[in-house]
Design a protein with these regions (language model features):
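A charged, amphipathic alpha-helical module
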Residues: 114-116
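An N-terminally biased module of ancient metal coordination in phosphate/nucleic-acid-related enzymes
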Residues: 1-106, 111, 183-200
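Domain-core and long-helix interface of multi-subunit machines
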Residues: 22, 102, 118-121, 125-206
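Glycine-rich, charged/polar anion/phosphate-binding loops
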Residues: 110-112, 162-163
Length: 206
């Protein structure tokens, strides 16, 4: 098995969240890239989170840190400039793609397309982190709020996969980020995923 794995290229299509550009990550972007080089990766896609289109769309830690949407948009633009620079700096050691991870909420498609037109990413990672305005992967408390807003666990799963389907249809991203992220804080996720109204949406999205 080891000999087989040694002949397989190491790649990453959804990596590179850094403490420099993401409030819930660590290390600088250059340190992240150096770690990929040291680990022997052939190529990597750096995919920081896109900036929120308004203060209401921020992550809880961004709100708690008093990081406004305007500041986060400026930081996101700085990320692109920094990543493009590192792309050139390490071009002889690692093939780097400068991309970003989308957010999905009402009105986000137009904003994503605006960012694509301005920054011209190498590709997109399409993700859903918010359902009914609640962040579903931050902590258990925020997840419970999302369940309450949806009315039930089953309804939350359905809304998540419906939002994901809309994102897939509208943006056609090259990569789907953590397809089943909705299960992160659901101890009974296998049972929930198996519910007919949920599973039919999973199959549709796949």
């Amino acid at each position: 098995m080891a000999s087989v794995l040694s002949g397989i290229d190491k790649v990453s299509v959804h990596g590179g969240h850094s403490g420099q550009f993401c409030h819930h990550a660590s290390d600088s972007l250059e340190e992240v890239i150096r770690a990929y080089i040291e680990a022997g990766f052939s190529w990597v896609g750096i995919t920081e989170h896109m900036a929120p289109m308004s203060d209401a769309c921020r992550y809880p830690d961004e709100s708690e840190g008093d990081l406004g949407a305007d500041f986060l948009l400026d930081r996101f633009r700085t990320y692109f400039n920094e990543c493009r620079s590192l792309q050139q700096k390490y071009s002889n050691k690692l093939e780097i793609f400068t991309a970003f991870e989308t957010e999905t909420y009402e009105g986000s498609t137009d904003f994503v397309n605006q960012l694509i037109g301005e920054l011209k990413p190498d590709y997109l990672v399409g993700s859903v982190h918010h359902v009914h305005g609640h962040c579903i992967d931050y902590d258990e408390n925020h997840f419970k709020q999302a369940v309450e807003a949806a009315g039930s666990m089953e309804a939350l799963y359905q809304a998540y996969f419906d939002a994901q389907y809309g994102m897939l249809t509208d943006l056609e991203p090259s990569v789907v980020g953590h397809f089943d992220l909705i299960r992160k804080f659901d101890a009974n996720y296998l049972q929930t995923l198996g519910m007919p109204g949920v599973w039919e949406r999973v199959e549709r999205n796949l």
